[in-house]
Amino acid sequence: MDLSILIPTYNNINYLKLLCKSLKENSNFQHQLIFHINDGSDGSLEFIKNENYLYTHSKDNIGLCSSIKEASKLIKNDYVLYTHDDMYFCKDWDIFLKNEINKIQNKYFYLSGASVSYKDSYIHYDCGKSYENFNIKKFNDFCLVDNSPDYKASHYAPHVVHKDLWNKVDGFSLDFDPGDGSDPDFCMKLWLENVRIFKCISKFKVYHFGSVTTRKKNIKLNKGTKKFLLKYGFNPKFFRKYYLKSDGVLKYAGPVTEPIFSFTFLIDIIINKLKYYYFKIT
């Protein structure tokens, strides 16, 4: 099972090298790696060229969604995986993913990897706070013995969908550039196409250093929550809680169902509608 892996990057060469190392050493199939290099003056453009990877390039930082739009033009495989450039993939990650996809036997799914990190994540386990002190052996050993269950998936990378589904919803929405809110928007578009399997595969682990790009001082984020609210009538938190049923780290319990009406649902939707109309008139 070969994947097309989309990787946007913005001057994170040391993390990028670590990501590429993990995909090279820990994969079992010949995946198609497609990078979009924003700027690349830190040496990342030269690195990708020297490694003969497929890539697109922009002189300036064009934002996450536009980066993915450019890279996705080169997709050739049936499954599309999106990942951050500051992640390290565990051994045999693609075997675990392949086994799960084979169980489903249809195209209507959203599967994600379980993020391991020293801070907020599915699994809290400190293997280092940066590429400089990352303990690969500690992470590998942890992956071998950890028996965490599969989780209800939220809208976090890395995630994989079928190419037909990716094309049907047109990938990430450009109106969410430079990127905040693009992940829940992508999942909402999948929901509207009747995807109900949103599952995080615990054995498919990545170590995440915590959104290195968005922590840069020169990155100005868009108001993704507001954009999402104006587009759908409720915010991403409401979507996670009542649609994905994943407001927190929760054990997977099967395909999600339609939102269930309750008193808390009523209160939350009223609050969201009030915010919606406030944003519309301001």
What residue ranges belong to the model's regions?
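Cell-envelope/extracellular polymer assembly enzymes that use nucleotide-activated donors
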Residues: D2-S4, Q32, D185
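Short, acidic, metal-binding catalytic loop of nucleotide-sugar glycosyltransferases
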Residues: K21-Q30
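A conserved acidic beta->alpha catalytic loop
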Residues: F29, I37-E46
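Glycine-rich, basic loop-to-helix element that forms the pyrophosphate-binding segment
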Residues: S58-I75
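Short aromatic/hydrophobic "clamp" motif used to bind/position activated sugar donors
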Residues: V80
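Conserved donor NDP-sugar-binding/catalytic core segment of glycosyltransferases
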Residues: K91-S130
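C-terminal, non-catalytic tails of nucleotide-sugar-dependent glycosyltransferases
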Residues: Y110, D120-I123, G128-Y151, H155-V160, ...
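A short, conserved alpha-helix in the catalytic core of glycosyltransferases
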Residues: K152-D170, F176-F204
